[in-house]
Amino acid sequence: MLTVKKKKELFRIIALCVAVISILVLPFAVFGGRLKNTGVFALSGEKCIDFGIKAPVNAAKSAIVIDARTGNVLFSSNADEKRGMASTTKIMTALLAIESCDPEAEFQIPAEAVGVEGSSVYLKEGEPLTLRELLYCLMLESGNDAATAIAVCLAGSTREFAEEMNSRAKELGLKSTRFANPHGLSNDGHYTTARELAIITAEAMKYPLFREIVATKSHKVRYNGVENARHLTNHNKLLFGYDGANGVKTGYTAKDGRCLVSSAERDGMFIIAVTLCDPFPTSTHKTLLDAAFDSFEQAELALEGEITAEIPVINGESAFVKATNAESVSLCLPKGSRTELSLIVPESINAPAVCGETAAYAVFSVNGKEVCIINLETTASINEKKKSFFEKIFGD
């Protein structure tokens, strides 16, 4: 997935390089399919699409449901209000740990991680655990001691680790999120929004290890060196009774209330839901996820090779080169939506042309909003036309 910054650079390149844009608008019927990301990027971050549908009635102070693959917003309610996030903080803790360290690296539990306030897996000073084991302790039992151990082992202190969490949030383009610790105990300088927590979660779900851990109902790790002696149970009730549920994290403090981030896959759709300060999070998430699966579908936009453009080639052995989409494309859209396809095609390209190069773009729109852009790649290499004896001497 391209970052917002890279997308802006891409649009600038298109504006500079495309002298003449030819637009072809065609209606595409919507039907089920599966997303393939190669050569395709949805408009995310600042360009993320919000379908403008209010979340179903629920008791949460803030709520949002997004398409995990694109970040497009399916439903939301007060999604940009800053709130405490309790132990859903640990999603960022896990993300940062997975990105910065070998999961099989073994650590000795530091003294700072023993007896930490709140939920605990009762770590003992000096006991050996791998990062993988600590991550299971972190995400299943929500161990604040595990969060502290990860922070101290990877960054030297919880304070330094929190600063790294803030740097990662900044990289993700988040402007309303700040971390003061790795575990989520209430702090006035520790907050996020439902929207930005959903973005963090979508980023974390890109990693197979993270997905594996948050989908696990129960697990065993070492306890003070004894294999499989520490029994862990996931606190996320949705994993035990909701069809397709595969993550991610619960949270609670007296100040922040009950927080929950959940995810589920069904019928080709991959959905993330977030609620902050909700007295009935499990019930709310069932309602939100049901509404998403009932109202949206993974819509097939184009089969592989279905979108084509012919581009004139200057000084080429062939006068034209064909460009097409190398992968099929599907997107999570409201049921019954119809899309428009616009082609961005240069007036011409110069030889030589290399097979597989991006030469044009296809833009899909729903109700006038651009929802994804697809690279159209050349299907053949075109060599530069050899000049005749007279052309070499006298020019064209």
Segments from the language model and where they lie:
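Generic detector of short alpha-helix boundary/capping microenvironments
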Residues: 10, 14-15, 51, 58-59, ...
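Active-site-adjacent loops and short helices of periplasmic peptidoglycan-processing enzymes
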Residues: 2, 32-195, 199-208
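Sec-dependent N-terminal signal peptides of Gram-positive bacterial secreted proteins and lipoproteins
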Residues: 10-32
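N-terminal Lys/Arg-rich, disordered targeting/topogenic segments
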Residues: 1-11
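Short, compositionally biased leader-like segments
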Residues: 25-42, 323-337
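Domain-terminus/edge residues, biased toward the C-terminal soluble/receptor-binding domains
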Residues: 174-175, 186-191, 195-396
